[in-house]
Each structure stands twice: as C-alpha cells, then as structure tokens.
Amino acid sequence: MANNSVMMKKKLEGKVAIVTGGASGIGEATARLFVKYGARAVVIADIQSELGRSVAESIGKERCSFVQCDVADEEQVKSMIEWTATTYGGLDVMFSNAGVLNSAAQTVKDLDLPLFDKVMRVNTRGAAVCVKQAARKMVELGRGGSIICNAGSSAVRGAHGVTDYVMSKHAVIGLVRSASMQLGAHSIRVNSVSPMAVATPLTRNQGISTPDDVQKFLMPFISLKGVPPTAEQVAEAAAFLGSDEAAFVTGHDLPVDGGVLCMPFLLGSA
C-alpha cells in the first residue's frame, strides 16, 4: 500500500509544467499539487506579481518559479515559455487556467461590449495564445507533451446571465477539440477540465466567496451530495491529464462538477 502511495505521488516526476493564473484559486492548488506529484519544475505565470512570487516562494524556489505574464499578450507568453524551456530544459505540461468573470449580469439585451471584450481577451484569446505557443515549443522539442485548458461547466450549456463568460468558455472547448486533432501527430495531447464553481477569487464577482456561498447557491443544482467542490479536486483532474496515466486521452473535456450536467441549472431563477 505504501509503495502504491509513493508511486501515485510521483505521477509527474521529472516533468516541467507551466500553470497560468497560478497565483490563486485553482491555479495555485494545481501548482502545489504538481510539485507534490514530483514535477521537476512548475512555473506560475500570472499578472499578480506580489501574490505570485509569494506562492512560488511558499512552494519552494528550487521547484517553483514565478513569471509575470499577461496571457493575452502573445509576446509575453512566448517569452515566458522560452524562458521556462531554457531554464528547465523543456516543457511537458501547459495548464492554461487564467480567466476572468465580470460582476455585471451581462444578459444578451444589456451586454456591455467593453466588458465583453475584456472577458474574451483573457478567456478566449489568452487560451489560444497559450495553446499556440506551448504547441510550438513542444513540437520544436520533439518529445510530445500535454496541454490542458480550464473550460468550465459553462462551456457546454447556456445561462441566464454572464453571456460573455459562457461564450468565452464555449470557444475554449472548440480550441481544445481542434488542437487535439492537429497536434496528435506530434504526440501532444490537448484536453480540458470543466469545474463547477468553487470559492476562488474569480467567483467573488458573482457573490460566491466562501464554502457557505457554494453550499447555498450551487449545491442545489448538483446531483452529488455531501461532497463540496474544491480547487484541489480540479487540480487532481489536471494532474491526471498532465500525467502518463492519461497517455491515450486527448480531445476530452473532463467535468469536475458533481454531476451538475445531469440537472437543470437555471442560475438566477432559484
């Protein structure tokens, strides 16, 4: 039993990974878990410089670094990926996780287009930039790799609000499916994780800041009872997709949502 535990903890042994949006929430949980599972190096890429450096230092500077990076700026992403590959001798896993969510209702009739552009810039353009540049580096290195995007449960259905966010996440699924087909010849796998909302800095804009908020507003729509959603659960899914355990998995969206897709989800009408 002990041997199995040790093996599981080393599922990412020797791998070099990048986690965008890694300074908080799901990204932070993933960076910590990747190191726990034996990753040789994890680079946190985020615009939150002070917080990102603090997280990297708490994980350990010998295994974790921080690079300030705006994921929608292609030159910054390209530079960050080049620095990672040069510093650590490769790139095995890219987790495109950075995202934003407006506090406005953003219904179709009242869609604020400047806010819409902000969401699409980070969630859709940012994901495309990260996938593109990671793919280029992985093809150049010639040893395959795993690219993971954070799509979300909003990526496969509509909603009564946050139209811009829903649209941005639908686009991520299209990106994952297309990239998986195009990059398979290079032994590069492309998948996504789709969490239900957990209490992270992102969800605060929608009034979900604590586990109690999750319990009140979201759990009624989840079929699995007694298991509150956490960032660590999503991190485990990302670790699986980044590891050799998922060696024959590509083009897949892995829901981490407690069965929310099995039930009506009418946000705002409860």
Curated annotation (Swiss-Prot):
Family: Belongs to the short-chain dehydrogenases/reductases (SDR) family.
Effect of S154L: Abolishes catalytic activity
PANTHER family in UniProt: SHORT-CHAIN DEHYDROGENASE REDUCTASE, SHORT-CHAIN DEHYDROGENASE REDUCTASE 3B-LIKE
The reaction(s) this protein catalyses: (S)-8-oxocitronellyl enol = cis-cis-nepetalactol
Name of this protein: (+)-cis,cis-nepetalactol synthase NEPS3
MF-aspect GO terms: isomerase activity
Self-association and partners: Forms homotetramers.
Functional note: Functions as a non-oxidoreductive cyclase to promote the formation of cis-cis-nepetalactol. Cis-cis-nepetalactol is then oxidized by NEPS1 into cis-cis-nepetalactone, which belongs to a family of metabolites that are both insect-repellent and have euphoric effect in cats. Binds NAD(+) as classical short-chain dehydrogenase/reductase (SDR), but does not utilize it for its redox-neutral cyclase activity.
Chain residues that bind NAD(+): 21-27, 46-48, 70-71, 97, 165-169, 198-202
Outcome after substituting N150T: No effect on catalytic activity
Gene name of the encoded protein: NEPS3
Enzyme class: isomerase
